[in-house]
Amino acid sequence: MYNQPEVALEKYELTVSRIIKGRGAYICDTGIGQKLLVPYRGHEQRACTLRDTLAFIQRNGMDVEQISQTKEQCIISRDNCEDAYILKDYRAGRECSTDSIDDMRGGSRALAQLHNILEKYPLPSDIDVESLHEKAQRKCAQIVKLKNYILRRSKTNAFEHLFYECYERFLEQGKKSAEILCELENSKTLVPTYCHGAFNQHNVVYTQSGRWLPVNFETMHPGYPETDLAEYMRKMLEKNHWDTAVADAILDSYCSVRSLDDTSMLSLIHISEPT
């Protein structure tokens, strides 16, 4: 009896010689190079949009992963349990090290290059873009909910005690962020594009060609490119004790490829929101 990845792979016009279990995916040696079989939780139309967007990025000079079609020209294949997968090119490389300022700079430049390309890709006029200030408000509500949960407990541990002491400061930061983001969104000065959606040290690699390359675009969505940059900075800063020199290096590297105006810089305030 076939294993689940083998059932999904037989839907494609290719010969597979070896399958290796990777991080949440299957690395496949095939007659046309290495492929990655990845579980997919979206619908077919979203997968088609992702495939078209990745093709656009590649045509515009960034050799990102491309998604394969099945024998029936579908994007999604299913295994014997009806779980969905997509098959894409495997871009081998070394992940960004959060201990290396050069790596973090390289990842930041790659993100800026990606954003330069994506801003040329037109979004449908009726597409929904997640509101930044509403997201900030939800995070504030979560902080209040957590505080109320701690208050109801008869005993608290050291972490919960520390959280309660810092609660007001974090909540005020979140409220200030939501207020500023609301003003920016109302001014219509932020321009939405497609965003990577999960740009961190695991999703940008240094390839054999000597270039940094974003990978794993499954969470790509319409939004504001500044959110990618802010989340990347947050991840790097968390790993480096919130060293402001790291933030400066990441911003400088990004801006060396893609400039940020005052509005874009101000929108990065949501990095201060509690997570």
Model regions and ranges:
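ATP-binding glycine-rich phosphate-binding loop
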Residues: 7-29
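Active-site acidic catalytic loop and adjacent metal/ATP-binding pocket
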Residues: 27-29, 67, 178-227
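Residue-level detector of conserved catalytic or cofactor/ligand-binding positions
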Residues: 267-275
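ATP-dependent phospho-/nucleotidyl transfer catalytic cores
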Residues: 18, 38-45, 96, 124-194
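Active-site activation/catalytic loop segments of kinase-like enzymes and analogous catalytic loops
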Residues: 226-259, 272
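ATP-binding pocket architecture of kinase catalytic cores
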Residues: 33-125
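All-alpha amphipathic helical-bundle segments outside canonical DNA-binding/catalytic cores
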Residues: 127-131, 262-268
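Protein kinase-like catalytic domain
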Residues: 58, 115-119, 237, 255-258, ...
